[in-house]
Amino acid sequence: MNFKKGEVILAPMASYTHSAFRRLCRRLGADRTYTELISAVGVLRNGIPMKLAYFTEEERPIHIQVFGSNPEEIAQASVVIAKELKPDFIDINFGCSVPKVLRNKAAGYMLQCPPLMGEVVKETVEALKPYGIPVSAKIRLGFEKDEVERIVEELQKAGVSLIAIHARTAKQGFSGKALWHRIKEAKKVASVPIIGSGDVKSWRDIERMFEETECDGVMVGRAALSNPWIFKEFKEKRDIEVGLKERMDFILEELSMMTEYMSREKACAEIKSQIVQILKGVPNSRELKTYIVHAENCKELVKRIEEAKERELLYA
């Protein structure tokens, strides 16, 4: 299995962690990446959604993340993906707590029934054996009740190779504090590598999570959207001041890469949410964000980004 203890990993985040962003984070020091959520039913009905599943060799090791409510469908969709794309892992998402997903009794909803989670993993592991692709899982502490040890044991018994634990319940979403000590307790019953996740906001938090939980890897989520340099900071053990010009260069490079798997107009529309994120914490950025994201077309958007680079001193 392709995993090294001590890895720092970019978490999957819907609408953000597509191929371009993943590549840039790998260049900045992320050790591993995951795709956004891909519906098993969608794959079986309509084929693989390439905007979500597209990746380059630079992004490896990569986990293609699948969700659903039916073990057989998840296993079948995983085989379709394995045959066509040959990822390093198929990841089964049991952690997403978005209401729409929960209403479909998928992902985080399944935390209510650990034996069913085990069945999903077991069927998928068996289905993927001919392709030599292992199965990982992304979980939370539980649905409403914290029963993470039981969940870990069920998944191990079913043949999972790697587990990422977000240290909140599905009901909590992102509210309250992530209970890092529960990752440590889950690690005690684990025979597979455990990746810790939740409330990792700086490179020092990455260091602290390794120390406090004894986890094998740390997953960085929302903090990487505003500071993708967090991976480089951890590797170099220092804070890195990133100016407006460098932030806007990041956006322009991401935008250029996005056109490999979507139209330029679509890329320009989608990059706006990342612009808002990457300007977080930049002094006097409120009016700059508004100015850039209200560009009416691609040409105007790029022009405004270039203007922002030239005006860096005004925002320093």
From Swiss-Prot:
Record keywords, A-Z: Flavoprotein, FMN, NADP, Oxidoreductase, RNA-binding, tRNA processing, tRNA-binding
Catalytic activities: a 5,6-dihydrouridine in tRNA + NAD(+) = a uridine in tRNA + NADH + H(+); a 5,6-dihydrouridine in tRNA + NADP(+) = a uridine in tRNA + NADPH + H(+)
Annotated binding of FMN, by residue: 12-14, 65, 138, 197-199, 221-222
Required cofactor names: FMN
Active site per UniProt: 96 (proton donor)
Function summary: Catalyzes the synthesis of 5,6-dihydrouridine (D), a modified base found in the D-loop of most tRNAs, via the reduction of the C5-C6 double bond in target uridines.
This protein's name: Probable tRNA-dihydrouridine synthase
Organism listed in the record: Aquifex aeolicus (strain VF5)
Designated gene of the protein: dus
